Amino acid sequence: MIVLDEQLLSYGLRALIARWYRGTVTDITQLRPNTVISDEAIPPLLRAAPRPTFVTINVTDFWRRVVPDVRFCIACFAVPHTRAEEIPDLLRRLFALAPFRTHSQRLGKIARISQRQV
């Protein structure tokens, strides 16, 4: 399951990722509908979801701030919102790397991804 941060909803990323990702692609607001979700509430929501990979551009609040957990993966994309359309390709490249190829390999990891490095 791929879970998009709510700040990525207006970019059409769900459909772009769903073109190549075989599992569920959703957003964080679907995990707790009709509520405001603070950044602090996201890890507990991810723990309750089935093997999620959370995708965000909010590097400041998630990279090296959230404690890794074997029940989820967080992919922090260090790209400005004006380049959010690059995220599906970067995510696909991330999933091609050995430590991220399968759910079981990526769970428990928090990655910071840019155009140049993971």
Predicted features and spans:
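Short helix-initiation/N-cap motifs at beta->coil->alpha
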Residues: 32-41
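Surface-exposed alpha-helical segments enriched in charged/polar residues
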Residues: 44-47, 96
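Acidic, PIN/NYN-like endoribonuclease modules and their adjacent C-terminal/linker elements
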Residues: 1-6, 10-21, 40, 62-118
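Proline-centered flexible-loop/turn and helix-kink motifs
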Residues: 21-22, 50
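A short beta-strand-loop structural module common to alpha/beta enzyme folds
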Residues: 23-33
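Conserved beta-strand termini and adjacent loop/short-helix elements that scaffold enzyme active sites
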Residues: 28-30, 57, 77, 113
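Acidic, metal-binding active-site segment of PIN/NYN-like and related structure-specific nucleases
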Residues: 39, 46-68
